[in-house]
Regions:
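N-terminal helical cap/lid subdomain that shapes the substrate entry/recognition surface
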Residues: 2-88
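Acidic di-acidic motifs
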Residues: 16, 162-163
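Short helix-capping segments at alpha-helix termini
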Residues: 29-35, 96-97, 120-124, 151-153
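Short, acidic loop-to-helix structural element flanking the phosphoryl-transfer center
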Residues: 75-103, 109-113, 138-141, 145
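Short beta-strand immediately N-terminal to the catalytic nucleophile in serine-hydrolase-like folds
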Residues: 104, 161-162
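Substrate-recognition "cap/lid" segment bordering the active-site pocket of phosphatases
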Residues: 109-159, 165-172
Length: 172
């Protein structure tokens, strides 16, 4: 049996910087908060969105920021995203070798699925896991635990591929 492989989405399969930073700027602007330039917001790619907005606008405005962010993201931001070169070929090769492939992202699952469909990658994955819009499963460790349980996979028999410390911590 080949090793099941879990991939993060943002920063691993795609470069979401433009969409994420523009949506953060939009949310902050709408609430008349200081708006950092896009480069100063790259640290927000990876961790749960609510957590980033707590740091940017404070706990009292974080939920409003998330709502505004998602309004723009659902219409525009998810398409302000670039597929990394070679990703489709890699996924195809892994599937042809017999690996079961999964996505495990702290981004809401509904958006993950739309992005995978947009880039015609959905066909390579046996399962797609993401957080829920109500905030459940934002923690990468909790999300991976859920995905492993749903798929009947032992964690030590699988691999997590990601780009941030949240991915590494979640896989432990």
């Amino acid at each position: 049996m080949s090793t099941p492989i879990f991939f993060d989405l943002d920063g691993t399969l795609t470069d979401p910087q433009q969409g994420i930073t523009r949506c953060i700027q939009f949310a902050l602007e709408q609430l008349q908060q200081p708006v950092p330039d896009a480069q100063a917001l790259t640290w927000c790619i990876g961790p749960p969105l609510h957590q980033s907005f707590v740091e940017l606008a404070g706990a009292e405005l974080a939920e409003q920021c998330v709502v505004l962010y998602r309004q723009r993201f659902a219409r525009i931001g998810l398409y302000e995203n670039q597929l990394y070169e070679g990703v489709p070929e890699l996924l195809s090769q892994l599937r042809n070798r017999g690996n079961d492939l999964f996505v495990a992202s702290s981004k809401p699952r509904v958006f993950v699925e739309r992005i995978l469909e947009h880039f015609e990658l959905i066909q390579y994955f046996s399962g797609v896991y993401g957080s829920e819009l109500d905030g459940r499963l934002q923690d990468k460790g909790e999300l991976l635990g859920h995905a492993l349980a749903m798929e009947g996979i032992v964690g030590s028999d699988s691999v997590m591929v990601g780009d941030r410390h949240h991915d590494a911590l979640g896989a432990v």
